[in-house]
């Protein structure tokens, strides 16, 4: 049986924790930041866990 390929786009976006959950960054933090408030930018900088429903397809994309 051939080896499973890792989706490189998912590898760049998600990080797997020791418990098997995935971490991700917030959207809307790339550009056009002058019109956003400091509070909004600070909250968008935090890293959050992916929900359980969204983590199932990520597990298929990141087999190792």
UniProtKB/Swiss-Prot annotation:
Pfam families with a match to the protein in the record: Ribosomal_L35p
GO molecular function list: structural constituent of ribosome
Gene3D superfamilies: 4.10.410.60
Superkingdom, natural source: Eukaryota
Record flagged with keyword Lipoprotein: no
InterPro entries per UniProt: Ribosomal_bL35, Ribosomal_bL35-like, Ribosomal_bL35_CS, Ribosomal_bL35_sf
Keyword Ribosomal protein: yes
GO BP annotations, alphabetical order: translation
A GO cellular-component term linked to this record: chloroplast
Xref: PANTHER family: 54S RIBOSOMAL PROTEIN BL35M, LARGE RIBOSOMAL SUBUNIT PROTEIN BL35M
Protein family per UniProt: Belongs to the bacterial ribosomal protein bL35 family.
Protein's name according to its UniProt entry: Large ribosomal subunit protein bL35c
Record organism: Trieres chinensis (Marine centric diatom)
